[in-house]
Amino acid sequence: MSAGKIVQIIGAVIDVEFPENAVPKVYDALKVAEGGLTLEVQQQLGGGIVRCIAMGSSDGLKRGLSVSNTGKPISVPVGTKTLGRIMNVLGEPVDEQGPIGAEEEWAIHREAPSYEEQSNSTELLETGIKVIDLICPFAKGGKVGLFGGAGVGKTVNMMELIRNIAIEHSGFSVFAGVGERTREGNDFYHEMTDSNVLDKVSLVYGQMNEPPGNRLRVALTGLTMAEKFRDEGRDVLFFVDNIYRYTLAGTEVSALLGRMPSAVGYQPTLAEEMGVLQERITSTKTGSITSVQAVYVPADDLTDPSPATTFAHLDSTVVLSRNIASLGIYPAVDPLDSTSRQLDPQVVGQEHYDVARGVQGILQRYKELKDIIAILGMDELSEDDKLVVARARKIERFLSQPFFVAEVFTGSPGKYVSLKDTIRGFKGILEGEYDHIPEQAFYMVGSIEEVVEKAKNM
């Protein structure tokens, strides 16, 4: 173990001088002797000086402090001992439940699986959320992105997915909280405890108030834990909230390291950083990682470089829309903007495909007619168009659903709707079986039977 000393401190960026013959490698972890702060080497500047990012607050550091080289990258505990625990970016427990006691530690920087190791899957993963199962179905071992601006329900949707999938699915899950609110992390912990699934989830948090180094690396820490479960032959769920904060931390670090910014001030290495993370989130012939990632969309602009870079890596995209949220329809998923590679007759079957496309067709037609209705009113429409509008409004409302995790706010019990019931319900609306039922009956219910029941009491 070689020793060096701090020569410069600029916020979270720290320069350390080592003897010329013992300069640490890029990504090596260094330890400050006083206080035990971990640093990660980012650049070698020449003359024995390395530039590092602090994995914690740099308060109280001063020039001349001794720093030792661990000779290896940041390593975190992996395996079943991490289940039910809350850890930070370094894999240290933050839940006051004693040491993790894992038998094995893995470095957080790893190679992505090679081309021949990867496997593709077309098996569907049922979520119990109507709009998702119908319009943008998830694949087991696939990657899903939840896109949305501020306050349209990304985290609530994520929590509902975790509740539905983690409870129905008996495997293990890893949750990486990347630069999100500590309150949400706390809520999530209690939600898992109340649902009795905490012993199947590993939690890794690097919250909003932490330095950029923590937020940049915490996604890799969580991913490393998920990879261990996958390599043991399990099917793992990997949840990330929020991928945008990972990009943002990269932007902060990049600026501190003195790189020239690119479009909109993002780091020049944006696509590469995203690729390094996303290429590791993949299923192999041994086991699968199904990942659900929340993606914040700055100023509701999907063409912003950060969400646009994320799009390329995903199998399903669930786009949450402020317009739909403003109508009081939750989950506020936009059925015309959301996509899935699984929505193919050879994967989901002809009936599911036809119903999904039929629903999108009617909603698209309604969208086109809205301008005419706004100017001339409903009376000027042809009988056929009036029917389209009536059915579209019913479909819009039937796409809403009460969530288990939102019971406290809505006061109505959550509903899990099977894919079979979802297809049957929407097929009935498209075929005109429910034309006689008022549209209010379709709002915030589970299956189509509940609509019929609700209509009787109206």
Curated annotation (Swiss-Prot):
EC number from the UniProt entry: 7.1.2.2
Q: Which SUPFAM superfamilies match?
A: C-terminal domain of alpha and beta subunits of F1 ATP synthase (SSF47917), N-terminal domain of alpha and beta subunits of F1 ATP synthase (SSF50615), P-loop containing nucleoside triphosphate hydrolases (SSF52540)
Transmembrane region(s):
none
Superkingdom of the source? Bacteria
Bilayer topology reads: Peripheral membrane protein
Oligomeric state and interaction partners are given as: F-type ATPases have 2 components, CF(1) - the catalytic core - and CF(0) - the membrane proton channel. CF(1) has five subunits: alpha(3), beta(3), gamma(1), delta(1), epsilon(1). CF(0) has three main subunits: a(1), b(2) and c(9-12). The alpha and beta chains form an alternating ring which encloses part of the gamma chain. CF(1) is attached to CF(0) by a central stalk formed by the gamma and epsilon chains, while a peripheral stalk is formed by the delta and b chains.
Protein name, please?
A: ATP synthase subunit beta
